[in-house]
Amino acid sequence: MAQQKFLHQRPIQNPFTNPFSSSPLSTSSISNRPISLLSRNGLLLLLALLVILGVFLPWAGSPLFPSPNKLSPSQSKWRDYSLPQAVKFVAKNGTVIVCAVSYPYLPFLNNWLISVSRQKHQDQVLVIAEDYATLYKVNEKWPGHAVLIPPALDSQTAHKFGSQGFFNFTARRPQHLLEILELGYNVMYNDVDMVWLQDPFQYLEGKHDAYFMDDMTAIKPLDHSHDLPPPGKKGRTYICSCMIFLRPTNGAKLLMKKWIEELETQPWSRAKKANDQPGFNWALNKTANQVDMYLLSQAAFPTGGLYFKNKTWVKETKGKHAIIHNNYIVGFEKKIKRFRDFNLWLVDDHASESPLGKLE
């Protein structure tokens, strides 16, 4: 687990375009002579038809490619649902909790939602859907709690860590957060491969601009400093972009703008295979003197490389954990297995506790 402005300037691909429709052909482009299926041209046409059917038919009933003729009135409504409308609907006490989700991540969304519901904060959740299938599924089950900010992404590539699709997916995050700050709301962002064990809001001490958690596995003392840690070997810190809380201050907005700038100057390439986290850390380091920052307690917000790999530390800090992040591991099945091993995969037995219920 940055919305650069150029991402919004790309031509928007309409996922509802019918792949089988075409404009009428002019009579000048069609021969009046009948084509025999046994002729060379006939065989080529037949082969082309079979290829087209083989490619598109398996997707015909897929939720990722809904037909424009099959859109219900409610689905059409959600296509026009805006971020200001959505934030106003879900916000409580001036605060909204957001996550960004593509269709393959729905099981993780549901698992995370169960844990959020147990802390009585589910009504504040806004799912930023990265594809129309997610938008429709969430709003079908939980009306008003999902919004799509165009352009929609390819959900089949957005979840592959290190891919350009994954970069495009994560790179939109600071722009989403900045837009919410500009609307005047506090915002908490979570990756959905997380589980809440306690209410994290009790740890947001003071009135700082930005709160975040360290992604390092080195054990800190329980009374460690809450200042931004010193840079590591790469010249920057190693803060996780998976869990962030921001107040609608000039400092928080400056941090998001700098994050966007960093992602624009360090785009994805086959050589680097970047994600959004290095850009976030450079932004933190470059604005440290202008933004009031707060490093959250390691005991309450441990990285997965510590929580899942150091049993002694987990026992010593028992009862202090607020949010567990299932990182330092790649792959859906591996993440699910690890959650199950630690009794944190809640959807198997507790799906009814999620606002989405059991997802088929």
Curated annotation (Swiss-Prot):
Leader sequence residues: none
Tissue specificity remark: Widely expressed.
The protein's required cofactors: Mn(2+); Mg(2+)
Protein family (similarity comment): Belongs to the glycosyltransferase 77 family.
Motif (DXD motif): 191-193
Positions annotated with a glycan in the UniProt record: N93, N168, N285, N310
Protein's UniProt name: UDP-D-xylose:L-fucose alpha-1,3-D-xylosyltransferase MGP4
Keyword check for rRNA-binding: no
Keyword entries, A-Z: Cell wall biogenesis/degradation, Glycoprotein, Glycosyltransferase, Golgi apparatus, Membrane, Signal-anchor, Transferase, Transmembrane, Transmembrane helix
Species the sequence originates in: Arabidopsis thaliana (Mouse-ear cress)
Disulfide feature: none
Start and end residues of each stretch annotated as Disordered: 1-25
